[in-house]
Structure formats: C-alpha cells, structure tokens
Amino acid sequence: MELKKNYKFWFATGSQDLYGDECLSHVAKHAQIIVQNFNESGILPFEVVWKPTLIDSTSIRRTFEEANADEECAGVITWMHTFSPAKSWIAGLQAFKKPLLHLHTQFNEEIPYDTIDMDFMNENQSAHGDREFGHIVTLPHLCICGM
C-alpha cells in the first residue's frame, strides 16, 4: 500500500437498538471520542473517520461495501460498544475485502462500582459483544484488547 496517498481508516461501532435512542447517542459519543483521541495521538499514519453506529445487518453490509468501493479507505476498525449480535456482521464481513482491525475494549477506563446499575451494564457490554464478534471473524485480522 502506497503510504504517500491520503488514506483513511473507518471506525465502525457495533450496537443494537434494544436499549433505545439515549443509549445509542452515548454509543455514538463514545465512538467519536475514541476517533478524536486516535487522530490527536498522532500514532496512526492516517486519519480515522467516524461512521454512524451500525445496528443491523443491512447497515453493516452497506458500510463494508462502501469501504470496499472507497479508494481512500485503507481499512476498517471495528468496535462493539454494547452487545452487537455477531450474526449481524456475517454478511458484511464476507463482503469485505480490505484490512480489518478489531478493537476489543471497554470505553470506560474504570468501572463505577459505587454507582453501577443495569442501565450502565446494558450500555457497556463491549466485552461480551467483542468476544462474540472476534469468534465469528474469519478474515485475517488483528484484535487489540484493552483493560
């Protein structure tokens, strides 16, 4: 891959609409913060571009097909914020032809043990969603796990 070209990495966040619009707005905000931090860090050779949260197999497949067609897209970084059913990703992953990096981490650096409730638990299930997603990924990929 020619590094002189102005490539971009897409950041695709998985979730589902089971927990409602408020939860999905938190998911989008968290993903945008991660993208901003990637871009401000200077550790990646190209810009990371936030994509809207993917909540169903149709939007997932469409996003991967658009990534395939976009000559500036060097690859996609995936992250499962809330529990994103892995079966929703199968058709998109089968269609995808570019590098994939699976970011397997929670958004929060620390768990708020004193105030944790079911809303927090439901909204922050990335560990479960990422494990299931990692299991079904059949393309050569890299999985980065955080603490």
Pin down the residues of each PLM region:
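Metallocofactor- and cofactor-centric catalytic cores in central/energy metabolism, strongly enriched
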Residues: 1-147
